[in-house]
C-alpha cells in the first residue's frame, strides 16, 4: 500500500540550506498569507516559526535540520515563503517555537483518518514515508490508519481491499491491537467472509483454494494459524468428498457424461483429496468425454460451408471429403484424402491417388475410386461435378492401390476441385461409415452431443468417446467456465479476449491460432432494393461505415497480428509474407471512413435516380429501409448495430434482422444486406463460392464473373495472381460487396489436454490424437 514515490517530494531538498538568523522582526510579521488556509498536503514544504511577542505564525523555507532539539542561541537566517529572494535575520530570543512541516503534515494526516478521508490520509502518510521517514510517531500513526481503514473496507463490503490492508499492517506489527481487537483476529474474520463468498455464493472454488493455500503458507504454523482457513478448508474437503461419492455412483450406473462433470467439479474443489486423482484419471481413461464451449450453434454440419463456422466445425465430426485441405503452403494448400495420399505432377497435367489400408486392413480399391472419379466427369450422370469435368480427361488404374488422372490442361490445383462429401456417392457407403468419426446423439438449444461411431477407425490411442458442445451466448461466461474446468476447450475466442490473453500470458488457459483467418463483408441483394444497383449509393454506404473504429472496438484497443480492414473479401494473411495472401492485392487501398463523403455520394445517388425518372417522366424510386441480416453471434451483432446506426446519419434507415439458430444465410434472401464471415482455405477454389454466380456474395457484374471464370481456367500461378489482381480491383471499384475486415482466429483449452495443435484448419482436425487429462494442475 505504501512505498510508492510521491510527486509532492520531488526536488524538496534543493531549496534547503543552513541559514544564520539576522532579520528584523517587523519584516516577519508581513509574511502571513492566505496560504494558511490550504491543506499542508497540497502545498510545497515549509516550516513555521511562532513569535513570542504576539504569537504570530510565519512560514519559512524548510530548515536543513529536521530536529526540534536545536541549539537556541544567537540568531538565524531564514527566507520567508512570501519573499524567498531576501534573507531575514531573527534572534532566537524572539522565537517561541518552530513547527516543522512533517509534524504539521502528520497531524493533518491523523485528522484525515478521524474524518474518514482515507484517500487524503494515504497521500499524506505516503509523502511522509518518502520524504520524512524518521518523523516521530509516523509508524504508530500509519498502523492505526491501516486498521481503521481496514475496518471501513469491511463495513463497505470491500473485503479484498480489507485483507490486503490488514496483511500490510500484520507485516508491520503482528501484535497490533486497537479497541480490544487484534489485527490477527480481524484478518481471520475478513478471510472467513471472503472464503464464504467465494465458496457459498460464487462457487469459485479455485480462487478459494488458492487463497487458502497462500494464507497457509504465510500464517499456517503455531499461533499465527488462521482459524478461518481451517474452517473453510474443511468445507472444501467435505464438498469434494460428496462429489467423490456421487462420482462413484455415476460410474457404476455408466452415466459417463454426468460422471465427467462431477469429476471436474471434484478436482476443481479439492484435487488433493485422497483418491481423487486416481478416480478422475480412471474416469477419463474408461470413457473420455470432451466438453467444448461454442459461441455459434450448428444447424446442419457441413465441412465445406465456408460462411458457416459452426457447420464447418461440426462437419469434420460427421462428414469427410474425398480430398481435404490440411494447411496452407507456398503455392496453394496441402491436401490429403481419408483413403490415402493425393498429389499432382510437377507440370500440373496429372493427379495421382495412392490408396492405403486402414488400421483394420481394409482399403478402398482403385477401381471403386476410379468409378467415382469418372462419375463426377459424366455430364449425364447424377454425380456430375462441373468443375471436375472441366479438367479431368482420363482416369487410369495403374494397380490396385494407385490411380492416375490425366488432365485436359495444366491445372495448378486439381485436387482442390475434389473437395466433395463422401456421403454424396452412395456406392461407397460401406467405406464412408468407417470414415465418419462421430454422429449426433442429441441436438438442443443448449448443446449438441456427439458419440463415437462404433465402426469409426481411429489413428489415436484413446480418442474421446463422446464430444459435448455447449452453447454460450456470452464469451465472458465461456472463458470463465474454461478457467474453472467446466469445459475443456473454447472453440473460438472473441478478438479482444485473444489479444488480452496473449498479452497477459495467462497460465490457466492455453491459446492457439487457427491456420486460416475469417474475412468479413456485407453481401448485397440488388434484386430486392433498387438503390443497391447504384454505384454512388454503394460508395456512400462503404464510406459511412467506420471500419477501423469497429475493428478497434472488437479488439478493445489492442492489436492482434493479421486483424485489419480489407478492400475485398479475400484473405490478406497475417503478414505480407503469409502464403495465404497470394490472392490479395495490397496495392488497392481501403476506403477510409468519411461521413462527409458519404453524404455527398448519397446526394449524387439521389440525383442520378431523379435524372433517370425525369427522362422517363415518372417518379424516382423511394428510398426504402435497408434490411441488414446477420447471424446470432456476438461479433456480427456488435458490428451490425454500429453499421445500422451509421447508415441513419446519411438518411438511410436500416432494420436489423437476426437469423435463426445456427443460420448464416436466408435461403429466401429476404434481406438487402447480409453480414458474412467466411473462412477461405484456398482462394483459387473458394472464390467461385464466394463471389461467383451462385456464391454468397454473388453479383450480376459481368467483370467479376469474367475474372472468377478466368481464375478457374488459369494454367499457372502467374495467371492466377494476375486475374486475382483484376478481380480485386473490380470488387473494390464497383463495390459489388462491402468488404469489412479480416480477423485472425484463435481457440483456447485448459492445460493438460494433448493433441491440440497450432494452426489447425478445423478444431476437430486431429481429434483422434486428443488425450484428455484431469490432472488438478489444469485448474491451478
Language-model segments: what does each one mean?
Residues 248, 264, 268, 272-274, ...:
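Extracytoplasmic/peripheral linker and loop segments enriched in polar/acidic and small residues
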Residues 293-346, 374, 433:
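N-terminal lobe/hinge region of extracytoplasmic solute-binding protein
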Residues 313-314, 320, 327-329, 400, ...:
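Gly/Pro-rich hinge or "lid" segments in bacterial periplasmic/extracellular proteins
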Residues 354, 361-362, 384-428:
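Surface-exposed binding/hinge segments that line
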Residues 356-359, 375, 455-500, 655:
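Ligand-site clamp/hinge motif
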Residues 482, 648-694:
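Periplasmic binding protein-like
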Residues 561-611, 630-638:
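Structural transition elements
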Residues 749-780:
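Long beta-strand-rich cores associated with HINT superfamily self-processing modules
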Amino acid at each position: 500500500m505504501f512505498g510508492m514515490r510521491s510527486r509532492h517530494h520531488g526536488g524538496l531538498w534543493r531549496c534547503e540550506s543552513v541559514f544564520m538568523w539576522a532579520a528584523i522582526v517587523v519584516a516577519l510579521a508581513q509574511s502571513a498569507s492566505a496560504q494558511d488556509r490550504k491543506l499542508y498536503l497540497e502545498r510545497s514544504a515549509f516550516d513555521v516559526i511562532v513569535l513570542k511577542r504576539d504569537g504570530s505564525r510565519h512560514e519559512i523555507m524548510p530548515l536543513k535540520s529536521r530536529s526540534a532539539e536545536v541549539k537556541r542561541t544567537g540568531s538565524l537566517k531564514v527566507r520567508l515563503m512570501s519573499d524567498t529572494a531576501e534573507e531575514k535575520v531573527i534572534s532566537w530570543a524572539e522565537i517561541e517555537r518552530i513547527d516543522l512541516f512533517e509534524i504539521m503534515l502528520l497531524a493533518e494526516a491523523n485528522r484525515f483518518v478521524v474524518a474518514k478521508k482515507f484517500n487524503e490520509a494515504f497521500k499524506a502518510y505516503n509523502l511522509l514515508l518518502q520524504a520524512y521517514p524518521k518523523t516521530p510517531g509516523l509508524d504508530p500513526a500509519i498502523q492505526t490508519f491501516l486498521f481503521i481503514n481496514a475496518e471501513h473496507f469491511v463495513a463497505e463490503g470491500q473485503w479484498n481491499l480489507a485483507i490486503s490492508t490488514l496483511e500490510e499492517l500484520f507485516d508491520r506489527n503482528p501484535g497490533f491491537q486497537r479497541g480490544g481487537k487484534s489485527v490477527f483476529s480481524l484478518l481471520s474474520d475478513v478471510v472467513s467472509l471472503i472464503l464464504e463468498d467465494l465458496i457459498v455464493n460464487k462457487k469459485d472454488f479455485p480462487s478459494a483454494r488458492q487463497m487458502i493455500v497462500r494464507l497457509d503458507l504465510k500464517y499456517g504454523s503455531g499461533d499465527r494459524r488462521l482459524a478461518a482457513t481451517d474452517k473453510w478448508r474443511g468445507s472444501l474437503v467435505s464438498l469434494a468428498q460428496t462429489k467423490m461419492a456421487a462420482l462413484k455412483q455415476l460410474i457404476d450406473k455408466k452415466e459417463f457424461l454426468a460422471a465427467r462433470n462431477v469429476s471436474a467439479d471434484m478436482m476443481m474443489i479439492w484435487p488433493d483429496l485422497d483418491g481423487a486423482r486416481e478416480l478422475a484419471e480412471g474416469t477419463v481413461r474408461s470413457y473420455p468425454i470432451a466438453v467444448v464451449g461454442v459461441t455459434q450453434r450448428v444447424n446442419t454440419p457441413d465441412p465445406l460451408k465456408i460462411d458457416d463456422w459452426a457447420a464447418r466445425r461440426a462437419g469434420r465430426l460427421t462428414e469427410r471429403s474425398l480430398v481435404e485441405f490440411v494447411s496452407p503452403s507456398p503455392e496453394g494448400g496441402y491436401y490429403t484424402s481419408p483413403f490415402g495420399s493425393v498429389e499432382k505432377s510437377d507440370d500440373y497435367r496429372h493427379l495421382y491417388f495412392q490408396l492405403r489400408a486402414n488400421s483394420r486392413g481394409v482399403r478402398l480399391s482403385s477401381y471403386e475410386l476410379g468409378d467415382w472419379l469418372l462419375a463426377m466427369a459424366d455430364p449425364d450422370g447424377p454425380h456430375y461435378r462441373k468443375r471436375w469435368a472441366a479438367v479431368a480427361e482420363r482416369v487410369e488404374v495403374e494397380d490396385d492401390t494407385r490411380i492416375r488422372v490425366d488432365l485436359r490442361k495444366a491445372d495448378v490445383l486439381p485436387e482442390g476441385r475434389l473437395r466433395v462429401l463422401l456421403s454424396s456417392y452412395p456406392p461407397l457407403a460401406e467405406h464412408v461409415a468407417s470414415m465418419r468419426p462421430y454422429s449426433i446423439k442429441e441436438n438442443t438449444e443448449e448443446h449438441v452431443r456427439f458419440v463415437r461411431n462404433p465402426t469409426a477407425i481411429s489413428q489415436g490411442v484413446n480418442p474421446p468417446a463422446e464430444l459435448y458442445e455447449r452453447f454460450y451466448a456470452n464469451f465472458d461466461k465461456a472463458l470463465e467456465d474454461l478457467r474453472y474446468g467446466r469445459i475443456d476447450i473454447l472453440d473460438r475466442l472473441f478478438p479482444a479476449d485473444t489479444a488480452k490473453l496473449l498479452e497477459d500470458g495467462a497460465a490457466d488457459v492455453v491459446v492457439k491460432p487457427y491456420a486460416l483467418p475469417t474475412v468479413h463483408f456485407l453481401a448485397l441483394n440488388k434484386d430486392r432494393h433498387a438503390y443497391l444497383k447504384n454505384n454512388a449509393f454503394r460508395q456512400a454506404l462503404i464510406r459511412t461505415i467506420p471500419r477501423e473504429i469497429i475493428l478497434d472496438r472488437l479488439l478493445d484497443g489492442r492489436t492482434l497480428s493479421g486483424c485489419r480492414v480489407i478492400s475485398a473479401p479475400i484473405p490478406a494473411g497475417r503478414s505480407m509474407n503469409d502464403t495465404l495472401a497470394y490472392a490479395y492485392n495490397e496495392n488497392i487501398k481501403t476506403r477510409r471512413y468519411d461521413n462527409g463523403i458519404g453524404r455527398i455520394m448519397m446526394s449524387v445517388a439521389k440525383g442520378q435516380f431523379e435524372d433517370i425518372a425525369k427522362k422517363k417522366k415518372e417518379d424516382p424510386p423511394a428510398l426504402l429501409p435497408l434490411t441488414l441480416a446477420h447471424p446470432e453471434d456476438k461479433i456480427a451483432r456488435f458490428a451490425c448495430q454500429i453499421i445500422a446506426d451509421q447508415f441513419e446519419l446519411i438518411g438511410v434507415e436500416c432494420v436489423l434482422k437476426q437469423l435463426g439458430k445456427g443460420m448464416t444465410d436466408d435461403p429466401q434472401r429476404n434481406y438487402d444486406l447480409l453480414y458474412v464471415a467466411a473462412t477461405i482455405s484456398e482462394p483459387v477454389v473458394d472464390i467461385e463460392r464466394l463471389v461467383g454466380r451462385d456464391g454468397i456474395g454473388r453479383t450480376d457484374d459481368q467483370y467479376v464473373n469474367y475474372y472468377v471464370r478466368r481464375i478457374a481456367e488459369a494454367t499457372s500461378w502467374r495467371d492466377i495472381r494476375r486475374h486475382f489482381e483484376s478481380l480485386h480491383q473490380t470488387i473494390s471499384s464497383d463495390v459489388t460487396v462491402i468488404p469489412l475486415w479480416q480477423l485472425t482466429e484463435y481457440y483456447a483449452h485448459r492445460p493438460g489436454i494433448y493433441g491440440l495443435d497450432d494452426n489447425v484448419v478445423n478444431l476437430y482436425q486431429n481429434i483422434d490424437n486428443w488425450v484428455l487429462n484431469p490432472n488438478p494442475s489444469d485448474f491451478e
